[in-house]
């Protein structure tokens, strides 16, 4: 299987990527006699040492604010402390963070995952296992990370990294380095199958990510004309956030622009899962789009319990904001059948396409085919549940067998109509640069997700 380049932008996105790569690490062979039955080259880069051993590192470009990397130093595992002190002027800009016990143990070749808890995993680097190349770690120097809040400007603390336009402006300071780092990563690939981006939609990261994506398409993918490559974007929505008007504008801007600039867009009410691993990106994309390239928003995403595998199963009903972070043992309130990460309410949905990724379970496949009254796509992945057994993955499930659902339905139209009304009633401001162009793009998407005649659209056009 060919390679995927992952771009992860923001602390929350980096938490999800850390779980993705910890899952990859669990499949690495640590002895010459180990059986390798997993394609580690999809998400990991390799380099050989003189003694014949192989180093694996994430094929990833991570972006975070100052102090967002916690205790991890950019060159920590590539240069000795003496070399750094001898060659560079070291400027201390804040209190140095100490590693937690888990990371100290990893440095000594030991695993102490039992020491991890909600208090010592505030940063994704607190439980990350793999060593990143220095070129993978990119920092926005003008902004400082603040847990549970938007980042703040280091010169003007009252300014927050909170709106689409701020991210858009900030990107241009890093455009040359971003393109060069991506080029270096791309040159290490033999046959790239696509690019996977994870970012936030409610903050300035949406604008930053969109500008980066536009540049990548223009520089490397013939401005999107070349359909050979898959560009997937996973957009994280903070469902706990009661957005102020500017944050709502930013969310709308991010959803519309990123959907127009990607080949498949997954807006999620919080988590990005790695259940797709092992299935070729182009296959899933073709089946979900079904020839409608502009209908590329996957607005319903669910993780279901596999009843075929267990009769005693429950999903923990928790605050989904904790899914990307490690959590303490959680008390079970009830046992819902699924975790719903969808952007849209799935009630009364009429589906354009629906895909399932399941374990190698023929009875489950037959059950799903009987349940649906229209053609569906079922992909089997024997590794879908591996991440649930990873020692750094949060303990959110009672059982260890799930499958995932990705759907495109007409219910997205209702969300889009709400967004259009919000923008229509807005005044021109710095967050919305071109109000009428944005309304036009939203209207275009509404048409794609409309089945049959819609009287409300006729009323809108007459206004």
Swiss-Prot record:
A GO term from the CC aspect: mitochondrion
The entry's keywords: Mitochondrion
Presence of the UniProt keyword Mitochondrion in the record: yes
InterPro entries listed in its UniProt record: DML1/Misato, DML1/Misato_tubulin, Misato_II_tubulin-like, Tubulin/FtsZ_GTPase_sf
Entry keyword annotation includes Hydrolase: no
A Gene Ontology biological process term: mitochondrion organization
Localization per record: Mitochondrion
Family from the record: Belongs to the misato family.
Function: Involved in the partitioning of the mitochondrial organelle and mitochondrial DNA (mtDNA) inheritance.
Name assigned to this protein: Protein DML1
Gene: DML1
